[in-house]
Amino acid sequence: MKFAVAVIFTLALAMGVQSSVIPLLSQVAGHGLSYTAVSGPAVVASPWAVPAAHWPAAVNVASWPPAAIHAAAPAVLAAPAPAVVAAHAPSVVVAPVAHSGVYTAQTRGAIHTAPLAGHIQSVASINAAPAPGTL
């Protein structure tokens, strides 16, 4: 009996969470409330923000209606530019960096140390506890 009551309460809670009033109020123009609709500008959340999404990319959508799409572009003559020659910079030799991070493991007969690659500053990880079942 307790199990049946717990199942009923769990299902009631799940139905209450899924049937909240917030999704009902957040349905704007047929789509749900998105992150950009909450925090972004209104243009981003608007479903009509990109009216040219169904046209090819070659269509000029800067002006709507397309009045000046076929306007002739002015001719531009390029003047010769001076040649740029790159100067050779002195080569810089980078010395290898010794990593000082060390892992130390102590067993019954020996102490093992191993460098920890990738540590820039001094890091020590010491495992001095005996392995399980060795005492």
Curated annotation (Swiss-Prot):
Keyword Repeat attached: yes
Annotated keywords: Cuticle, Repeat, Signal
Tissues expressing this chain: Detected in the epidermis underlying the head and thorax (including legs and wings), but not in the abdominal epidermis of newly eclosed flies.
Sequence repeat positions: 72-75, 78-81, 128-131
Organism domain of life: Eukaryota
Function, in words: Component of the cuticle of the adult fruit fly. Could be involved in thickening of the hard adult cuticle.
InterPro entries (alphabetical): Cuticle_Acp1
PANTHER family according to UniProt: ADULT CUTICLE PROTEIN 1-RELATED
Pfam families in UniProt: Cuticle_4 (PF15955)
Signal peptide: 1-19
Name the record gives this protein: Adult cuticle protein 1
One biological process term in Gene Ontology: adult chitin-based cuticle development
UniProt free text on domains: The tetrapeptide (A-A-P-[AV]) repeats found throughout the protein are also present in many proteins constituting the protective envelope of other species.
Entry annotated with the keyword Methyltransferase: no
A GO MF label: structural constituent of adult chitin-based cuticle
